[in-house]
Amino acid sequence: TAQSTEADTELEEIVVTASGFAQKAKEAAASITVISSKDLETKAYRDVTDALKDVPGVVVTGGGSSSDISIRGMGSAYTMMLIDGKRVNSRGVRPNSDNAGIEQGWMPPITAIQRIEVIRGPASALYGSDAMGGVVNIITKKTADAWMGSIKTDATIQANSEGGNTYQTGVFVSGPLIQDVLGVRGTANYSHREEDKIIGGYKEQTMRNGNLVLSLTPNDQNTIEFEVLRSLQSRNATVGKTIDPTPTVSKGKLTYPTDSLTDYDRTQYSLTHQGYFENFTTQTYLQREENDNPSRSMFETNTILNTQNQFKFGNHALNVGGRWQREQLDDAGNQLSIGGTTLNQLERDSWAIFAEDEWRIVPQFALTGSLRYDQDENYGSNVTPKLYGVWQPNDQWIVKGGVSKGYKTPALRAATDGWGQTTGGGKSKGMIIGNSNLKPEKSTNVELSFNWDNNDNLAAGLTFFNTDFKDKITEVRSCVGDDVPGTLTCQWKGESFDFISQRENVDKAQMRGVEATFDWKITPTLDLAANYTYTDTEQKSGAFKGQPLNQMPKHMFNTTLNWQAHEKLSTWGRLNYRSRTSDYLSRTAMADSTPSYTFVDMGVVYKPKTEVNLTAGVYNVFDKQVDNADYGTTLDGRRFNVGFQYTF
C-alpha cells in the first residue's frame, strides 16, 4: 500500500488501503474504519489487538497471547494483516492453528503507529488471497526531517493474584543522517506476560522485536527505503500452572503431561520505491519474509515482488499493478513416506496482474471497477472482479455499495498428496492427509451503506452486508477409531493412528449482517462513539447444513466516552458487549455455544508537559469472569494499568 504524505486530520481522514493510494476515507470504495493517531494516544490502547476491539464487525477471538482477528463472520485465517501495505503471514509455521495469535505478536509498538486502517469485507481484487474476510493495515510513522522519538512503557497488574502481570516498553526514533537526502527510523519493543496459575489460562509470553529503515530521498519525487525487521516470540506453559497435571490413561498406561516451550522467529527484508509525480504515483517493493518455528523444525520463506501505479486523467484514477510470490516451506513433521522417501520441502509460485479504475461520472457519483487475474502453478487461473459505487447527493449524505469477489488458495501442506500432518493435541495420534485436488475457497460479497454527517457534532452510519461462501475447505474424517486415545485402530500405509482426516472442498455457507455506527460530540470537550454489529452465519451444505459456521456472537455493542476535563487531563470509558455465540463448526464437529459477557474499562490521560503522557486505567472494572470451562478460553479479570510516554 502506498503511504500518504498528508498528515491525518480530524476533518478529512485520509486512507490508502482501500485503493492503494491516498483518498478521503468517506469516499473510499469499501467499508473502512480508521483508528487515528489521536485515538491511539487518548484512549491509551495497550496494543493493536486492544485498539481493534472497538471496530464494528471485528471480533477479537481468544485472549491474551492467543488473540486472533476475525471480520464479518469469517475466521481469522481470512483476515490479511499488513504493515505499511506489506503482508505479514506466519501461519505456515503453526499448522492446525496451534498457538493462535502469533501474527498479532509481530505488530509494531503503539508508539510507532500513525494510524490503523481496517477494511471490512473482501479485498481480494486488490490484495489477492488471504484478504477474503478483510484487511488490517498498520500505518507506521514516517522518517522525520528533524530528530525526534518517543518511549512508552506500561505495566498491567492483575487484581487476582492467580493471573499473570504484563510489562512492556516500546521505542520509536527517527531523523536525518544527511539533511533532505538520507534519513533513518527505527523501533524496538519488549513485552513480557507472566504465566497464569489457572488451568487453561494464559501462557508465559515474551516478545521482542525491532526494525531499522533507511530512507533515501534523492529528490522531491522519489523515495527509496530499505528495511530490516526482526521479531522473536516465546511461549511457556507449565504443568500445574496452565497445564492440567492429571495424567491420561491409554491401554492401561499412565501418560503424564509435560511443560511446553515454543519459540517463533520472524525476519523481514524489504526494498521499496515510491514515486510522486503530477498525475502519476507509484510504489514497488521487494520483500522476503522468513518465519521459523524451531521447536517443530518448521521454516517458511515468502518472497514477494509487488507494484502499484496510479494514473490520473480526466475523471479517472486508474490503478494498475502486479505481484509475483514464491512460498517455500521446510518441515520435518511429514508423517507420510512414499517409496521410502519422506517429503519435507514444499514450494509454490504464483503471479497476478490487476487494474482498478475510479470513474467520477458526475461530481456527486464515482464508480469503481476492479479486475484481478491470478495464476498459480497448482491451481491455474482465477479472475476476481469488483464493482462499487459512491454517491454523495449533498454535503451531509454518502451512500456506498457494491459487489466484490474474494478467494483464498489452500495452504501448501493441505494441497500436497504426499503430506501427512500430525495432529491430536498430544492426547491422540492423528494425521491430516493433503489433497492436491483442493480448489481455492471463494466468496461473493454484497454491501450497501448509508452514512450521514452534519459536519458539526453528529454522524451516523448503517451498513448491510451479505457474503456467500463456497468451496470451503473442511477437515473430513476418513477413519475414526474408538474413544480411547492410543488404541490406534486406523491404518494408513503401514502406520497406525487414532484417526485419519483429509481436507476437502465440501461446504457452502452464508454470512450476513448489519453494522451501525453513531458519533456525537456532545460538547466541545465530551465525545460519545458507539457501534453495533449483528452477524448471522449458516452452513448451506455438508453434514451440518443449517447450522452456524463460526463462533461469532450474533450481537456486538461497543461504546466509548471521552471527556477532555482540562487541557492537561482527559478521561475515557469503554463498554464492550458480546452476546452468546451460536453453536459453531470446529474442525470436524459442531461445538457448543459460549455465554455472553460485558467488559467495562475506564482510565485517565494526564499531560503535565507537552512531551509527557501519564496514563492509568482499570480494565474489566466489574471483574467479569470468563474462564475456559464455560467460554473455551480464559480472559483476564479486573486489572490495573499504568503507563508513561515521553516524546522528544
Predicted regions and their residues:
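Short acidic/polar hinge/loop motifs at secondary-structure boundaries
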Residues: 88-120
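Extracytoplasmic beta-strand/coil segments of soluble accessory domains associated
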Residues: 49-90, 114
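N-terminal periplasmic accessory domains that precede
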Residues: 48-51, 67-70, 81-84, 103-109, ...
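Outer membrane beta-barrel strand-and-loop segments of large Gram-negative receptors
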Residues: 304-310, 321, 346, 352-354, ...
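Gram-negative outer-membrane beta-barrel transporters
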Residues: 152, 360-367, 466-468, 489-585, ...
